[in-house]
């Protein structure tokens, strides 16, 4: 086996890329997309409320 200086870095990138791909596939294949979108909407609204409260204090 040939060892290169970048082999550890590239293998880490490949592993994380595979994890991200599997996660996205799970979201799209198993209907998690709607739940995820609902979560993002709720989280966005919560952050907007926090921003409004912080701006009101100034």
Curated annotation (Swiss-Prot):
Subcellular localization, as worded in the UniProt entry: Mitochondrion inner membrane
Pathway assignment: Carbohydrate metabolism; tricarboxylic acid cycle
GO cellular component annotations of the record: mitochondrial inner membrane; respiratory chain complex II (succinate dehydrogenase)
Presence of keyword Mitochondrion: yes
Coiled-coil boundaries: none
Keyword Iron belongs to the record: no
Superkingdom: Eukaryota
UniProt topology in membrane: Peripheral membrane protein
Quaternary context: Component of complex II composed of eight subunits in plants: four classical SDH subunits SDH1, SDH2, SDH3 and SDH4 (a flavoprotein (FP), an iron-sulfur protein (IP), and a cytochrome b composed of a large and a small subunit.), as well as four subunits unknown in mitochondria from bacteria and heterotrophic eukaryotes.
Name by which UniProt lists this protein: Succinate dehydrogenase subunit 8A, mitochondrial
Species of origin: Oryza sativa subsp. japonica
Originating gene: SDH8A
């Amino acid at each position: 086996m040939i060892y290169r200086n970048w082999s550890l870095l590239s293998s880490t990138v490949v592993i994380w890329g595979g994890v991200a791909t599997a996660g996205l596939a799970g979201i799209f294949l198993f209907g998690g997309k709607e739940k995820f979108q609902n979560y993002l909407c709720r989280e966005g609204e919560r952050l907007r409320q926090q921003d409004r409260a912080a701006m009101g204090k100034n």
